[in-house]
Amino acid sequence: MLKPKEMDAYLMKAIKGTAGYFKLSPEELARTAGCKKATWYRRIKNPENFTLRELRRMIIRYSWDASTVCSFMGVEGK
């Protein structure tokens, strides 16, 4: 069983992979995440800097499902 922090790490990895699959631009990711203007510019330079809260907002906005997330994590979804 994964610990909560480990789950968060897997979640972030999965969402970043999924974003690449949907070919979303960094600008779209930043807007969807609801970043403040100053933060937005840092995020578009390096999407790895998105926080877990911002990434979760993107899951909801783009309706990423578990099977899609799992496939990009390289694990079997149940």
Predicted regions located by residue number:
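Residues in the helix-turn-helix
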Residues: 28, 39, 68
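DNA major-groove recognition helix of helix-turn-helix/homeodomain DNA-binding modules
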Residues: 53-68
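DNA major-groove recognition helix of helix-turn-helix
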Residues: 44, 54, 73
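Short amphipathic recognition helices of helix-turn-helix/homeodomain-type DNA-binding modules
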Residues: 69-78
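Short coil turns linking two alpha-helices in DNA-binding domains
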Residues: 25, 36-37, 51, 65
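Recognition helix of helix-turn-helix/homeodomain-like DNA-binding domains
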Residues: 34-50
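A short, Lys/Arg-rich alpha-helix, primarily the initiator
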Residues: 1-24, 28
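Alpha-helical residues within the helix-turn-helix
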Residues: 20, 31, 60
